[in-house]
């Protein structure tokens, strides 16, 4: 099995090295990752300049682009052999609920949706590396077992690992996405020359985080695994829209 590994924290981030170490004994792994932190890049592509891959001393490929750029190039000519699946992470920080709309980690996995295997996005719910071994364990476990998984084509599996030692993790729960409240207002700053600027604030707290959600599972000490689909159509709105359109002249 051949796996393309990507992330959004950057090619030198500890999480991607940990993911490679977790999977390399069981698969032929190649790493293509941004040359700098691209957190929050979502599914953006770089269209205003050329992309230049550079192979590092450890064999990883660094790219001056986004997480989606990395996977896009990997699946469309940069690699001599097409991977069987894409695995993204390990992100240092949660990708729960609405986070998946902004996450470069999740976006990298989404770009791998055309391959025969499901794509995985792994996140550790911490900015610290203490419990990376826990996330490594579950990445290894889930990816190794993926061939026994019967899911529709183009399924993306979003996995969040609680910030706990392995022995304290209670298990794995199948979850739906929760929802966050609105984020706090951007933080206004003024530079020494008097020019105003803004820092984007932290994401909002969980607003829909009850039982069955990814938020709840992680808070209770479980690994959450949420299947994502690419159909963003809001089917429940069809009735009201159909009636509304019928009344237009």
From Swiss-Prot:
<keyword id="KW-0547">Nucleotide-binding</keyword>
<dbReference type="InterPro" id="IPR002828">
    <property type="entry name" value="SurE-like_Pase/nucleotidase"/>
</dbReference>
<feature type="binding site">
    <location>
        <position position="39"/>
    </location>
    <ligand>
        <name>a divalent metal cation</name>
    </ligand>
</feature>
<protein>
    <recommendedName>
        <fullName>5'-nucleotidase SurE</fullName>
        <ecNumber>3.1.3.5</ecNumber>
    </recommendedName>
</protein>
<dbReference type="Pfam" id="PF01975">
    <property type="entry name" value="SurE"/>
</dbReference>
<dbReference type="GO" id="GO:0004309">
    <property type="term" value="F:exopolyphosphatase activity"/>
</dbReference>
<dbReference type="GO" id="GO:0008254">
    <property type="term" value="F:3'-nucleotidase activity"/>
</dbReference>
<keyword id="KW-0963">Cytoplasm</keyword>
<keyword id="KW-0479">Metal-binding</keyword>
<feature type="binding site">
    <location>
        <position position="91"/>
    </location>
    <ligand>
        <name>a divalent metal cation</name>
    </ligand>
</feature>
<dbReference type="GO" id="GO:0005737">
    <property type="term" value="C:cytoplasm"/>
</dbReference>
<keyword id="KW-0378">Hydrolase</keyword>
<comment type="function">
    <text>Nucleotidase that shows phosphatase activity on nucleoside 5'-monophosphates.</text>
</comment>
<dbReference type="InterPro" id="IPR036523">
    <property type="entry name" value="SurE-like_sf"/>
</dbReference>
<feature type="binding site">
    <location>
        <position position="9"/>
    </location>
    <ligand>
        <name>a divalent metal cation</name>
    </ligand>
</feature>
<comment type="similarity">
    <text>Belongs to the SurE nucleotidase family.</text>
</comment>
<dbReference type="GO" id="GO:0000166">
    <property type="term" value="F:nucleotide binding"/>
</dbReference>
<feature type="binding site">
    <location>
        <position position="8"/>
    </location>
    <ligand>
        <name>a divalent metal cation</name>
    </ligand>
</feature>
<dbReference type="GO" id="GO:0008253">
    <property type="term" value="F:5'-nucleotidase activity"/>
</dbReference>
<dbReference type="GO" id="GO:0046872">
    <property type="term" value="F:metal ion binding"/>
</dbReference>
<dbReference type="InterPro" id="IPR030048">
    <property type="entry name" value="SurE"/>
</dbReference>
């Amino acid at each position: 099995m051949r796996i393309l590994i990507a992330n959004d924290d950057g090619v030198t981030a500890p999480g991607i090295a940990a993911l490679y170490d977790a999977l390399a004994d069981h698969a032929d792994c190649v790493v293509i990752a941004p040359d700098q932190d691209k957190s929050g890049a979502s599914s953006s592509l770089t269209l205003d300049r050329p992309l230049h891959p550079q192979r590092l001393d450890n064999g990883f490929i660094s790219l001056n682009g986004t997480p989606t750029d990395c996977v896009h190039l990997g699946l469309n000519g940069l690699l001599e052999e097409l991977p069987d699946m894409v695995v993204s992470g390990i992100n240092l920080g949660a990708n729960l609920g609405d986070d998946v709309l902004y996450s470069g980690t999740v976006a990298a996995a989404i770009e791998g949706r055309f391959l025969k295997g499901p794509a995985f996005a792994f996140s550790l719910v911490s900015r610290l590396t203490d419990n990376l071994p826990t996330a490594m364990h579950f990445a290894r476990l889930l990816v190794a077992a993926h061939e026994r998984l019967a899911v529709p084509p183009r399924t993306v599996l979003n996995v969040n690992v609680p910030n706990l030692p392995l022995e304290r993790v209670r298990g794995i729960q199948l979850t739906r996405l929760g929802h966050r409240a609105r984020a706090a207002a951007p933080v206004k700053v003024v530079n020494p020359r008097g020019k105003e600027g803004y820092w984007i604030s932290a994401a909002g707290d969980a607003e829909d985080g009850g039982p069955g959600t990814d938020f709840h599972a992680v808070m209770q000490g479980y690994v959450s695994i949420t299947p994502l689909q690419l159909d963003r159509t809001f089917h429940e709105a069809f009735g009201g829209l159909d009636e509304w359109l019928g009344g237009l002249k």
